Structures are given as structure tokens and as C-alpha cells.
């Protein structure tokens, strides 16, 4: 039986730097897992690439995927849909590949219900003032949207207790290294290693 891959879920409030930290992890030479590209209906930001950062689709296309059961999770956030296509995740995990998701907090909680064996990591800002500076620094939102994001961020940070790990994003390279250390440790946890030994012991006893 092929070893099942591990699902790694990174989420946190808007503006905390999830995408930046994820890029830092995947740009390093020692990353050996696959990134599952999320789907969204929001506008593409400068520097983003369709199919690499997100699949950018229309609202109608996204809702068609929901109706057909093609989404592992999805959420509507500040008037835009975000979600994770299911097919790629299932295929990769079944092939023994570790899969990395970078998703919104509500989506992560949906995944937790469906795939509780995943590794759930909450990326948090050093403080709320720094988070507001980061959102303003994007230059993509007006103050009404920024205020919505900040109110939502407070609610999302309260949900940190539902995660396995919390990582402070004070400096991007440090946050990336902390996450990689968590993943390395999880690969050697008893709950992930034991199924292989149970199969081996079963073969020895037969």
C-alpha cells in the first residue's frame, strides 16, 4: 500500500503575509511538497500569475464548481469567493505526496472537518497595528474595505485555538523556517509513521 501523503494547511488573517511566506518556502531548495493552487473570484494583484498564485475565475465559474462538488472548501470573503479544488488534492495525497494549502481561515475550518489528520498552521502578525500597516501598504483597498478586513482579522485570530501550531510572521525568512521545521517534525510523528509499521507487522505475523 502506498504511503498516504500529508496535508499541510497554512492560514491566517488577511494581510498577515500568507502568500509571501508561502513563496519563501517554495523558493527554497529544501522544499519537497506540492502547492495546491486555490481558486478565487477577486481581481488579480500586480505580480500575481494565473494558475500559479491563484486560478482567477468569474463568479459564475466558481459557483458551477460548487454545484458540481468540485471544491474541498470555499468561503466568501469581502465579497469574493476563495476555495480549493478537490481533485488535485485527492490524487496527490493518494500518490504519497505532501500537499501544501494556503487558504482563508473559514476554509481551513471546513478542511479540518473533512481531513482532520492534516497539519493546521496559523500565521499571525506580531500585533494588530502591524497588520493594518501591511493591508494599507498593499495599496489595493479603500478604507472601508480595510476596516472590514481588520474587523474580520480580530474574529479570525480568536480561532487560532482550533489550529495545531501558531507561527508569528515578524520576519518572512524566519516564519518560513519555523513552518518548515513543523513539517519536518510532523513527518516523524508516531501517528504518521505507525501505519507503515502496522502493515509490516501484519505481514510478519501472516
Swiss-Prot record:
It catalyses: GMP + ATP = GDP + ADP. It is an enzyme of class 2 (transferase). The keyword Kinase applies. Its main location: cytoplasm. Its EC number is 2.7.4.8. Signal peptide: none annotated. The keyword Cytoplasm applies. One of its GO terms (cellular component) is cytosol. GO terms for molecular function: ATP binding; guanylate kinase activity. Keywords: ATP-binding, Cytoplasm, Kinase, Nucleotide-binding, Transferase. ATP binds at residues 12-19. SMART domains: GuKc (SM00072). Residues 5-184 form the Guanylate kinase-like domain. It is found in: Cytoplasm. Essential for recycling GMP and indirectly, cGMP. Belongs to the guanylate kinase family. NCBIfam families: guanyl_kin. This is Guanylate kinase. It comes from Lactiplantibacillus plantarum (strain ATCC BAA-793 / NCIMB 8826 / WCFS1) (Lactobacillus plantarum).
